[in-house]
């Protein structure tokens, strides 16, 4: 039954709707300005500036929401507006969105503002956008001077080499390329290596998204090759090879490789999108099966991703019958974790009390999760979705889980009819706990898991992250086989840690003691002491000493800390180094290096 008013007679309703849309437009203008600035920072190789920009953009949305809430309360006494006017506000807002180019994001912004003002009993489709109201299908900017979502190129006309060069140069990056002809030849060789020689169908064409995707020290060209009924995805990272010179680093031609660079464990891209739904639809064609929620999140629209995820959860609950259960595995000291077996995510709640030796607070743990949200995750830390007042049907909660919730988090529970409302929780992608992966894996899987674990910790170290608790249970293995850290309550900046060697024992009593014979400060870390906790399994030990024998040497950790203190930002690649053109086709680089020996020496370094 439709409860909406027949007439839109409230001037306040229209004014409130217009004010809300103005604040959304301000938010999205800032969002796009950040992407434009990212291009300038990339061209100048200002990596610290790019990091700062990415951090600031994450908080921008909440700042605009709060500004909007304050204006509505001050100017319209929003909390006193009656139900009929609130319904008119939504209808007026829908009317304002009919020709908008980001309607889905504007609807999410409306929800964010309303959830700050209205009681949760209003969180239904009469008052907020539980379901979308404006279609984004075939949405484009039709203005003559507008940049299209993607450009189409036809290699059959000018040849593949000329077409690829045009694709790159159309982005009009300011620094020149070291040797673009060489890089184009590498792209063509990689395509041949991957697909062999294929016959060009009449519809042979290349589609390329019109904006670059910026993250870390790379700018990605993203597109697809169309040939007959085949859709072949690709991404080309552009990097600085030395001051003032660019190069194409590789071409990624497999869906699994693109899914990794767009994964939940990486920081968000900075990309300029006039019509974000069109970009997301394009990306869905090259990564089918990847949820739209994750794609919106990966391109920096994390609130839209969060909204879509919640809709996906509600849809899944209405089309499934299994129950939420306590997550299998070793229980954590600070988090209660549960899951729905048919849904590939875990739900994490901070406990009311923490047993010794944990010395922390709810506020401190929330700050750690916020630190990770704002930090460069490098594909090694899981992103989290944070929710408040989540209502779950009691009939879908396992009795053992309800008992566990009532025992561990009673302050966060509220019974409301047939639902249990959880006042605060985090949601993450479900992964295989690394301890179980190593325990149950084949010899090859154990070696892979250990190698990945060492790589993950070393990369986090270089990114100024000390995990704190190094146990395998705090790491997970993704469906792509990457090891990712996901337990953040003890996380610290490496530069805040004091890397120490274990002092030699003073006597035999010290040597036999089960307790440290030396003082340990709150920020002291002793890499030499990690061995007994990590190397108990003979298979794990053999793999660890094969791939990461230096892991327990304090010098490794101190060297990373020293470089960070000197302001150095190391290079990170979300793909295997063997895929880089300079590694894969070294003979093509020799001619360039022979013409400029200093370049070759710099690349080798």
Swiss-Prot record:
Binding site for ATP: 327-333, 348
Lineage, top ranks: Bacteria, Pseudomonadati, Pseudomonadota, Betaproteobacteria, Burkholderiales
Keyword ATP-binding part of the UniProt annotation: yes
Organism expressing this protein natively: Burkholderia multivorans (strain ATCC 17616 / 249)
InterPro entries: AceK_kinase (IPR046855), AceK_regulatory (IPR046854), Isocitrate_DH_AceK (IPR010452)
Gene Ontology biological process terms, A to Z: glucose metabolic process; glyoxylate cycle; tricarboxylic acid cycle
Active site: 383
Localization, UniProt: Cytoplasm
Keyword Coiled coil: no
Stated name of the protein: Isocitrate dehydrogenase kinase/phosphatase
MF GO annotations: [isocitrate dehydrogenase (NADP+)] kinase activity; AMP binding; ATP binding; phosphoprotein phosphatase activity; protein serine/threonine kinase activity
Stored PANTHER family: ISOCITRATE DEHYDROGENASE KINASE_PHOSPHATASE (PTHR39559:SF1), PTHR39559
Disulfide pairings: none
Documented EC number(s): 2.7.11.5, 3.1.3.-
Domain of life: Bacteria
Family (UniProt): Belongs to the AceK family.
Role noted for this protein: Bifunctional enzyme which can phosphorylate or dephosphorylate isocitrate dehydrogenase (IDH) on a specific serine residue. This is a regulatory mechanism which enables bacteria to bypass the Krebs cycle via the glyoxylate shunt in response to the source of carbon. When bacteria are grown on glucose, IDH is fully active and unphosphorylated, but when grown on acetate or ethanol, the activity of IDH declines drastically concomitant with its phosphorylation.
Gene symbol of the encoding locus: aceK
